Every structure is written in structure tokens, then in C-alpha cells.
Amino acid sequence: MILSHRYTLIALAAAILSSGAHAAGASVTASWGNVAEPSLPADSAVCKTLAATITPVSGSIDTVDGNPSNSQPDASRIQTAIDNCPAGQAVRLVKGSAGESGFLSGSLKLKSGVTLWIDTGVTLFASRNPADFDNGVGTCGTATTSNTKSCNALIVARDTVGSGIVGDGIIDGRGGSLVTSGPNANRLTWWDIAYLNKTKGLNQQNPRLVQLYNGSAFTLYRVTVQNSPNFHIVTTGTAGVTAWGIKIVTPSLAYTVPGYKCAAGTTPDKVTPATCFTPETVKNTDGFDPGQSTNVVLANSYISTGDDHVAIKASGGATRNLLFAHNHFYYGHGLSIGSETDGGVSNMQVTDLAMDGNDSSGGNGLRIKSDISRGGKVNNIVYNGICMRNVKEPLVFDPFYSTAKGSLYPNFTNIVVKNFHDLGSAKGIARTMTFLGYEAKKRTNPLTLTLDNVVFDGTQPAFDVAHNGGPASPNGTHFTFGGNGPVSFANAIVTSSTTDVTVTGTPGTAAAVDCSNAFVPLKSVAPTSPI
């Protein structure tokens, strides 16, 4: 009976997302089969329509909820609509009769088979009252010495089957707004609190925006997610996640200026409360983080944020079968695996990725990171068709991510980078690469890496220096040249039995990947973007 109910919910969810008039018919091919583009629900599949009552001004509603007693006026009616909605139907948030476009809520819980549809021009704003997210620990909205998490996410889906969040509207976490209760009330923004991790080594207790716990068949479609106080979208133990056409923009124009050209002395590294934010100063704002999850797709999406664009994690459980197809990344710390890999990460494909890092000081490209406190097997990872520019560290394979101690040894094997073209830096910033296996403490876990048609324009990147107790790069790396295309830095690789660096094969002569049409301005698809 339980299994029958589970598959009924999946079927109902499939019906709601395929019966509308917006189906595009596109699909991507994953290792486990074709994955079709979702669609918006049909009008007949809407169980409840809720109209907005708040009018934002320049993307802000801070004048509405200065009094914490009015911090989540829409939470009850949205939650009631979700609770009363039958499986296979959607709750739709729309504009009000006079053009009102804002909803304001604390933490919400999705249920199985129900889709939250945020309509075009509508924004679901998160409360800035930490009490609306506190999970009972009592420290949400502060920075603590304890790493115990104390905030619920804005939207939580726990053990759901066939749920989703769709629409051309926005979910806004308001990370740059002052919190309104607790010891930091009217003193610090969420992002100021997060910056205390850097300045004082404290753990910020800030809410995420979307958090999945277990469950299956979850859909994110076309929605914009921005200004999260912490991570934007996290899946934990979820089987089957499709994120298609989403946009992650942090900070948005509501909290910065065009081009992120903040005036001196206005950012959280210089003043609190800060009045202007850049990607470099909004800490721990990962974009899309699949953890301990399987059959995950991120396709045709756009991400610009202050931390990892993507962080694939495997903490205590495996993550496998992932596809990243036709995506555009901007500011951020890379398409990352790790740092938690002890459960194992395997079978991941990245195809047709454009990365424009805007010469950010913390910019990373393709990245696998771990250390002996949380390391494990990372195997069968293929990056194919990558266009990159203005990224400080384009290729990073690093098992010495930190100096933490332990006996969980990183092991990166069967990594393939092919049809990769880096156009260099508009500002002439020097690039570095890291190629390291874990060969220490009587362990020999070489990085096994195939390079084929990997081309850097201009001055070739340098190899990274020794850090965190590890050796200088390259070390413990077994290179294979695929033979179809060139490897522009091949002559810089020195084989040595001392460093356990080997090379098999020879580069080919195929033309570099054509990146002339790869890059698009983020604001052309996400109007709230400053770039």
C-alpha cells in the first residue's frame, strides 16, 4: 500500500507538470535515461489562488515589517492552502487586483504531491524576524561558537513525493536586510551575521531558502531564488531532483549597485550594518547543493552568488547520478564536489557549461575539494564542453582543502576534462591550477585525470603552491592525454617518480572549442541582476 501510494503521488505530480500549455518538449540525456523539461501547471490543476497584498519598492519591503509582530502576514494563508491542497495540484501566488506583488512569510512546509507556483511578477519574501525560523534551539539570527543549526529554511520539503516549486516569480531571502528581533535586532543584517564567521570564527545561524529532506521526484522550474541569508537550495537524501531554468542571483540590485561597484566603506568587511554588498562579501550563500542524493539534474539554469555555484556533498551517504547541462555560471566559487565526500560521489556529467567569473578574487571553475576529516571516493566525473573566462582558479582538484585532522582519505579517480576552453582574464589576472592526489600518511591515492582538448588562451596558468600541509602542484597525479585535441600546458607537466606525476598518451591537434557565443549577460535573463 505504501509503495502504491508513493507511485500514485509521482503520477499525479507528473500530470500537474505536463498538462499545462507551457510545455516546451525539450529534454536532456542522463545516464539513467532522458529527463524532460517540466512545465507549468494547467489552470485546472490549481487548488487555490492567493493574491498578493504588499507592494515592494525597488525590490524591498523593509518598510512593511519593521515591527516584528508583523513579520509574516502571509504565512498562515499560504500554509493553510498547501495543507488543504490535494496531491497532484498547485497553490498559485498571483498579483493583487491593484498590482500588489509581494508575499511575506516565515518558514513553510510543502507536502507530498503539491506544487507551489509563484506567478510572473510575484515575489515571496522571507521574514527578517529570526523567531519565524528558529527550530527551538533559540539562537537563529545570531553567530555562535556552537555549530548546532538553529534555523529552519523558508521552504521545507520533508519526505515528500512529487512536490515542486515552479513559476517565473521570485523567492527573496532578504539577506541584506536588518533582522528585527533578538540580540542583533536593527543592528546587523543576515549577511553581517554571516560575515562574523570570517572576522570572529563564529557559526552564523541563518536560514536557507529551500531545503529538501529525503523524499523523491522534486521539481524546481523557472523560479528565481535570490538573496539567501545562507545556502539557497539544498537537497539531503533526495532521490530524483530536476532543477530546470532556475536563476540564482545574489546579491540582487535591491542590496547593491550596478556592476557591484559599492562605495568604499559600505560593505560588511568594512562596516556593520553594511549598506552595500558584493558577491565576495555575502558568505556561505551556496547556490545549488545536492547532498546524499541521486538522479539530480540542473539544466538551462543561471547562477551568480557569493560561494559555490554548486556544491555536491556526500556526508555519511552516497551521491551519484548527476547531470549538469546547458548552464551559465557567473560570480562564485565553482562547480564543486566536496568538501564532504566520505559517502562517495560518482557518475557525474557536466556538459555545455559557460562560466564567466568576472575576475572575482574568490573565483573557481571546476573544483573537487576535500581533506582527511571528510574525504572519500570521487569517481567517474566527466566535464565536457566548457567555456570559461575571468576565473582566477579554473581547474582545482585538491585533497588538502583544509588542515583538519582525521582518517577519511580523499581519493579522486577517473576524472575527465575535455573540450575545455579558457579565454583568459579581461583584467589580466594570473590564473592557477591545482592537480593533487592524496599521497601522505602512508596512503597513495593518486588523482587519475584525463585531459583532451584543454586549451588556455594567452599566458598559461601557473601550478598552485603548497598549502594546508600538502605538496606543490602537480603531485600524485597520473595524467592521460586523450589524443583528440591539444593540452595547452602539456609542456609544463614534469613527470617524476619523486612526485608521482606520470603522463600517458600525447595531445591531439583538433581545434579549440568555439566559445564565441557561449556567454550572455545575467541581467538579460534575470532582471534583478546587477551584471
Swiss-Prot record:
It catalyses: (1,4-alpha-D-galacturonosyl)n+m + H2O = (1,4-alpha-D-galacturonosyl)n + (1,4-alpha-D-galacturonosyl)m. PROSITE patterns: POLYGALACTURONASE (PS00502). The active site is at 307 (proton donor), 333. Residues 518-531 are annotated as: Required for PGA export across the outer membrane and catalytic activity. GO terms for molecular function: polygalacturonase activity. Keywords: Cell wall biogenesis/degradation, Glycosidase, Hydrolase, Plasmid, Secreted, Signal. Residues 1-23 form the signal peptide. InterPro entries: GH28_Enzymes, Glyco_hydro_28, Pectin_lyas_fold, Pectin_lyase_fold/virulence. The keyword Heme does not apply. Its EC number is 3.2.1.15. Monomer. Belongs to the glycosyl hydrolase 28 family. This is Polygalacturonase.
